[in-house]
Regions:
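Short, low-complexity, polybasic intrinsically disordered segments
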Residues: 103-119
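Acidic-basic catalytic patches of nuclease active cores, encompassing PD-(D/E)XK
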Residues: 1-28
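Catalytic cores of nucleic-acid endonucleases
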Residues: 31, 56-106
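Active-site metal-binding core of divalent-cation-utilizing nuclease and nuclease-like domains
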Residues: 22-49
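Anionic group-transfer/hydrolysis microenvironments
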Residues: 27, 40-42, 55-57, 101, ...
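Short, conserved glycine- and acidic-residue-centered signature motifs
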Residues: 1, 5, 9, 35, ...
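Protein kinase-like catalytic core scaffold
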Residues: 48-50, 99, 109
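Conserved catalytic cores of phosphodiester-cleaving nucleases, focusing on short active-site segments
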Residues: 39-60, 77
């Protein structure tokens, strides 16, 4: 992973912790056989399990950033979240949320509930 991406994920994790969330996993991967991918951050926000995708960009063109999380990427994140839940059954009855965190030189933009499983 490029240094910019690592730094962005570290900033996003710190940001979520400052908001009172507990970071449970970073860079969680599912096997290729599951058709998933990677979830950058898995966190607890009270009684809600949050799966967060972090995007680090050198500009703050929010439209381009939002388009970077297309339906295919959303499906991969959802499949990876399902795989995480299959391994961690104690969380299967919790509320689930999919967030996107954009990191740019201007700051952090956190989109809670950026997409849902209906993708």
């Amino acid at each position: 992973m490029p240094e910019k991406g690592r730094a962005g994920e570290a900033a996003a994790a710190s940001f979520l912790e400052e908001k009172g969330m507990k970071i449970m996993e970073r860079n969680f991967r599912s096997p290729r056989t599951v058709r998933g991918g990677e979830v950058d951050i898995i966190a607890l926000d009270g009684e809600t399990l949050v799966f967060a995708e972090v995007k680090t960009w050198s500009t703050r063109e929010i439209d381009a950033l939002e388009q970077s999380i297309d339906n295919k990427k959303q499906r991969k994140i959802i499949e990876t979240a399902k795989y995480f839940l299959s391994l961690n059954r104690k969380y299967i009855y919790m509320a689930i949320r999919f967030d996107v965190i954009f990191i740019s030189p201007e700051g952090i933009t956190h989109l809670a509930s950026a997409f849902t499983e209906r993708v």
